[in-house]
Amino acid sequence: MLSHIVDILADPNDGTALSGADDFSRLVSESGHSYDVAKQGYVTLAAGAGLKHKGDDMDMVNARETYLAMGHFAPFVEAVTGAVQDGLDSASLAESTPASLLEVGAGTGYYLAHTLDSIAEARGVGLDISPHAAKHLAKCHPRVGAVVADVWERLPIQDESVDA
């Protein structure tokens, strides 16, 4: 949900902070840029002329989700979750602040959702270039905010805003 992670996000044009407007139907930057939130719950944060690449199409995203649901990658998701937990355990995080996680190339949110299930109160930002993947990502977990962005450009993330 974008309202849970908006403080992590940044305007892709100039890095200024974003805030929700019009009941979070838009995100607006301090410098006046505005980004519409899709009805499916994700936001596209692209600078200038927009995204240069399209990412996975709907068939590719559906095929990936079907394959992941078969459990073939269960050992990998367990390893990723364990590594994130170890990293957070060794970090000096304030106990009163929930951990903030970022997954770049998040796809449908398979890894991020599983990791959030294992880390109480943590919140996550999933970035992917595919709007089709972002539709799934936005629904994968109640503590995930889904963002369509080109990771070859400036990440739309505030400096020092994520823990893992």
Which residue stretches match the model-derived regions?
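Class I SAM-dependent methyltransferase Rossmann-like catalytic core
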Residues: 55-79
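Conserved SAM/SAH-binding beta-strand->alpha-helix loop
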Residues: 128-132
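Conserved SAM-binding strand-loop segment of SAM-dependent methyltransferases
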Residues: 142-153
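Conserved class I S-adenosyl-L-methionine
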Residues: 96-107
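N-terminal auxiliary segments of SAM/dcSAM-dependent transferases
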Residues: 1-54
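Conserved SAM-binding loop of SAM-dependent methyltransferases across substrates and taxa
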Residues: 108-120
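Conserved alpha-helix/loop element of class I SAM-dependent methyltransferases that forms part
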Residues: 71-96
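A short acidic, Gly/Pro-enriched loop at the edge of an enzyme's catalytic core
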Residues: 152-164
